[in-house]
């Protein structure tokens, strides 16, 4: 039976479309002033991004015990509670801060379930391993598609680009989303992806090609709009 990798169906219901840099800056300023509604909107923008990253850190055994969306909800609650501790002023600094909270949540959850689990689950996972895994997945997400040719005065930062691409990834049908996460973000070979998804290696290759084409089309529609 196929093993689903994507952030479960709750992510598909989240608002799609990523805000402009100016809008994020405005919401950061309002949230810092203590306004709760802008803070909620701000965090919601990064739900899909964080869910994608969380899903890359859970193998099929841990996914039986941990839900990516539950981990992200815990991350959002911590970010909402501790927002006054955020010292950055830019979208990329906010993304980095949220990612660090997610890393702490992931490490705690994985350590708890590894300790409670059987021998077939990794016994020990260091915080450095989680940091490395999340950072690698974030970089891979940002580089899935070629960057737009923006002017030097308006660079697309890696973190912001990754968050925007996660919104488009969330719009894909589940098997497309799964195969892109497994191949592009986790870097698994097709034979291993085939085992994860319960399909032949050839079928997985064709699925991945179709998924990438659809992903490009989805992203291009925003670029052209």
Where are these regions (language model features)?
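Amphipathic, Lys/Arg- and hydrophobic-enriched alpha-helical face
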Residues: 43-66, 81-85, 169, 214, ...
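Sigma70-family region 2
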Residues: 29-33, 56-63, 74-94, 112-114
